Amino acid sequence: DNDSTRSEEQWKGFEVRIYENMERIFRILEETDTKATFFVIGWIAKTYPDIVRQIASKYQVGSHTMNHQLVWQQSREAFKEDVSSSIKLLEDITGQKVEAFRAPGFSIRESEGWAFEILHELGIRMDSSVFPAHHAHGGMPSYVSAVPSWVEYNGIRMKEFPIVYRKILGKHIVFSGGGYFRLVPYRLLRKWTRECPEYLLAYMH
């Protein structure tokens, strides 16, 4: 989703760190007995199928599209083909049905509700694309639920696991993932985390 590194050819030129980093992630998850879903882009699956099979042996594997293109940059037809291709690839590699999805950059906005209809058609039953605040690539600041809930569009219902937020001065402030782990002071992270006994979703990219 970054114009400076959009092509697969450019990705191939970067240093390979996935094996070392995945071992660290697996170790942390095991030591803390933490559940996880890995939303995998198709390019990673094609390039490192052994890693995807290793993930699937212990954790849920979900689709993150083929090449991390933002939803609102695509037509309905292109989005359907994109997600369908990624699901087929992941299912062929893992031998397991793919039922979870996260949009690149949390790029399903209020105006892209049609994406849920397509996801449902493709067999997706759990989504984690809703970013209930403003975001550079999308976001749904009008979304009010801070716990697992349902999204509805044209008669379909899908289980949604939204990103966690705090409401401060009337605004939704996200804190539990990505760059927010670096921006939010640790004392606040710890305090807000402890104040989420019912549901806490953390994410890393």
Predicted regions and their residues:
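Catalytic alpha-helical scaffold of carbohydrate-active enzymes acting on polysaccharides/glycoconjugates
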Residues: 1-169, 184-205
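Binuclear metal-dependent hydrolase catalytic cores centered on His/Asp/Glu-rich metal-binding motifs
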Residues: 173-187
